[in-house]
Amino acid sequence: MQMFRHSSADMWRAKKPTLERRSTDGRRSSIVDWINGLSDNNNYKSDHWVEKHDEGCERMTRNGSVCAVEESEPDVPTQHREVLLTKLKIEIKNIMAEHGAKKYLNLNSPYVTSLCIAVDACIMDGLRRRLLTLFNSPSSMSLLQIIAKSNGPAQQVLDQTREIEELRTSAIPVHLIWIREALYLKSLSTIINHFIDSKSVRRYYDNSALLLDPVKGRLVATLMMAPCMVTYRRMSNRIEQEATAEELVEGATRGSTSTVPSRPPLSITRQVSSIAASVERNGSVSRDYVFSLHHSCKSTLLYGKNNVCVAMNGSDFAKGYMSLQKFYDGNLSLKWVPNQLMHASSQPSSGHSNNGEFTNIWKNTINIEMQDIIYIHLHQKDEISPTCLTFVNCEGVQSAPFQLPAGQHSIAFLSSLETGLAPLLRLDPPLWVGTTKEKILPRLRKRSTAVANPAMLDYVFRLVRTSGVEPAPEDIEDPLAPTSHSPPIHDNCVSLPNSPYIVDNVDSIVNFQIGTACQSMRNQIMARAFYGWLTYVRHLRTIRTHLLHLVDTKTLICDDDCDPVDEKFWKQARAEPTEENEKEFLKRVYWRGIEGINTKEVRRMAWPYLLGLFEWNESPESRLEQFTSQYWQDIEEWRVLEAEVRRRDEEAFRAARARKAASPVREESCDVFEDPNEPTCSQHYDRENLITLFRANLHRIDKDVERCDRNLMFFSNKDNLESLRRVMYTYVRRNLEEGYTQGMCDLLAPLLVTFEDEALTLECFSLLMLRQRGKFPQRPGMSKCLLNLRSLIQVVDPQIYALISDIDYAQALSFAFRWFLLDFKRELSYECTYKVWEVIWAAQRLRITDDFAIFFGLATITNYHDVLITNNFDYTDMIKFFNEMAERHDCSRLLSSARTHVKCLQNLVQHLK
């Protein structure tokens, strides 16, 4: 180690003439990784070696070393081309990420539209638009028309685009439609290459155009080869367009009378470079969903009327749009959407200032399936008054009354309804045909008790099948009977009695049918009771086999009526560090968490005790000094190793450049560290092994630290990133055999943000890793967590268990892998992460359960029961849904549900014992 100490720790930072290869690795494992490499290198140049000098600035190489490079300020056109290429790479990356989780992509997807916009911007760069005035509009579509005569794929795309434009089936501009169709026909890369090679097209471009660039122009065509490999599908029905996770959750809370069929896979909402594009995309999804409620290619619109009033709260009426649709299977659906929602959906989503009010409007939408309706009540005071329609389903539940304007609107609706019901159903009584061959309401039969004053016109229509002919009600006249009124029937009319034989025969048949129905009901009740008992026994067996060890029944804390830990309680508890105060502290953290005026300061003092770093009756001052001293000693030790690693990285860089320049005839070993003349003593071997292990971990840490929570204000400061790097280096140096695994930085970051003390953060992180290390790859802890979660779902929510049972066992709950690996750090915001971690630590210290994270995962899944079951999610849908819901969960609700699950399991286990 003496040879290392002669060099300063900052030796590797010295600026020396060196070489850097600025190119991407063409041997990436997948297209997505290749595109990632392209997007990371925004200053991409040709694949060649560039000489660097002392005047340049420092830049980290692929292995983390710092080399001196020379930077020249590009001109404005060059910068613009770089921006266009960067946006194009981002959109291609999003497309390929979507394709990696799906078998196909919707051609109307916002991701495809965003890619078309980026491609159109690249094609239009440097275009002399004044030379294209012979065409209708100077756009990329004009260039397609120019090459269509000499290029077969371009002509095919042009014909397809014209057909779509004539049918007007798309709302996007025509200069984007042809790009989308070229993607669908997998010929976009070929067409762009023809743009570059065609002399008739090149004359329309300036010399500084992107497509005329000898390198970047071809790069655009090459990049488009990846999206052309994706399988696209046309989905003209707007209801099949993908909804976001928030819309699915809102739809589940609204509730609907109709059964929602299986939904296509979800899309990932990603952030793009333009905020306006994101707003337009979200508004488009909401607008299309509202329009799809009334217009669909799978249904026929029979009737539509605006400004139809519906009683919402008591006597309050809201106006909206009502439509009657008939689907291809013969079913009819009546839908009503408030005007506020129709108007709001036509505006960008940023226009919704009050999300709560907008959500309440969504809850007022009505969807009635006519096959469930048996009665329709019509009430009208007189001919100049509005008409009220009320629908009653087979369970006797009435819908909100629909108020149609005065006039013939109610008759028009009933006529459309009667037409749509045929031939399977009909209205009873049917509508009459008047003298003008128009439908009219049936005439009520006049009664002798009628008064001279006009009464309300009340009708009750039944929906009956056409196969059975039933007698008309007594108060409705026969439309075929003569108009003259028959004499009234007197009450003293007498009829002959029925035959006793017939009466007895009918009674026996009725009794037999009733007995059969009762026996069937008895069998159903017995079967239901038996299967309920069988399910209960199976659940108890699952608890005995898999879940008995999850909770401790000796510690039953049922008193949840307590206050959170704040500054006042913390001072009182630390003033008298008794065992009772410690239990009270842990109980408060478990039930109510840590709150207060300065919550961060309270957490900074309380977390070391929660993690078990300090004993409750111990003062932390003396230990903190010891931690700090040991921490900086470890830093001095690994700085020597770091300097040697950086030096070897630079040597490897120069050696690789020399090998490429020399171009040897025969292949030699590429390991520049091997030296056959080196001694092979055990001491030297240990030193080399130490450097090799530390070098491998150092490079992995550097990559993860650079991308760790950069959206957080705390880590936008480079000094804090260096603190994170130092703490991670020190931990790995202390635990070099275990090494660094991706995800450790995610666990370390919240601790560093809270403590802002590197030595204390390292000690707490070491204790946290003692519990989390078993869940990392190559350890059995994660498999146990997923198995226990599966067993809990089987007991708590059999419907979700049946849903995941249809999925491959190895993949069923793999979306929860990241949950348990990082204790939900990436699923929650930082503040929610603090709350969940505190409860997990408190539950472990109270010996309630060592696996509270499993119960929190159970609460996360069961909280979205309606969304998962209603949409019949598969494995891919679940991954996308929970990825979209990241940092949007109701943390307090999930914690409360998790505590309830723990308490219920404790009671069951105690009952079994």
From Swiss-Prot:
Question: Where does this protein reside within or beyond the cell?
Answer: Golgi apparatus, trans-Golgi network; Early endosome; Cytoplasmic vesicle membrane
Q: Where is the RUN domain?
A: 106-240
Where is the stretch described as Disordered? Answer: 1-24
Location of the Rab-GAP TBC domain:
597-844
What organism is recorded for this protein?
Caenorhabditis elegans
Q: Which UniProt keywords apply?
A: Cytoplasmic vesicle, Endosome, Golgi apparatus, GTPase activation, Membrane
User: What GO CC terms are in its UniProt record?
Assistant: cytoplasmic vesicle membrane; cytosol; early endosome; Golgi medial cisterna; Golgi trans cisterna
Q: What is this protein called?
A: Rab GTPase-activating protein tbc-8
Q: Which SUPFAM superfamilies match?
A: RUN domain-like (SSF140741), Ypt/Rab-GAP domain of gyp1p (SSF47923)
Subunit description: Interacts with rab-19. Interacts with ric-19; the interaction is direct and may be required for the activation of rab-2 and dense vesicle maturation in cholinergic motoneurons. Interacts (via RUN domain) with rund-1. Does not interact with unc-108 (GTP-bound form).
Tissues and organs where the protein is expressed, per its UniProt entry? Expressed in neurons in the head, tail and ventral nerve cord (at protein level).
- Its biological purpose: Interacts with numerous Rab family members, functioning as Rab effector for some, and as GTPase activator for others. GTPase activator for rab-2. In association with ric-19 activates rab-2 during dense core vesicle maturation in cholinergic motoneurons.
Q: Which gene encodes it?
A: tbc-8
Specify the superkingdom.
Answer: Eukaryota
What is the deletion mutant like? RNAi-mediated knockdown results in neuronal dense core vesicle trafficking defects whereby fewer dense core vesicles are transported to axons of the dorsal nerve cord.
Task: Identify its protein family.
Answer: Belongs to the RUTBC family.
Set out the biological process GO terms recorded for this chain's protein: dense core granule maturation
- Pfam family, any one: PH_RBD
Question: Which SMART domains does the entry link to?
Answer: RUN, TBC
List the membrane topology term(s).
Answer: Peripheral membrane protein
Membrane in keyword set? yes
Q: Which PANTHER family does this UniProt record tie to the protein?
A: SMALL G PROTEIN SIGNALING MODULATOR 2-RELATED, TBC1 DOMAIN FAMILY MEMBER GTPASE-ACTIVATING PROTEIN
A molecular function (GO) held by this record is: GTPase activator activity
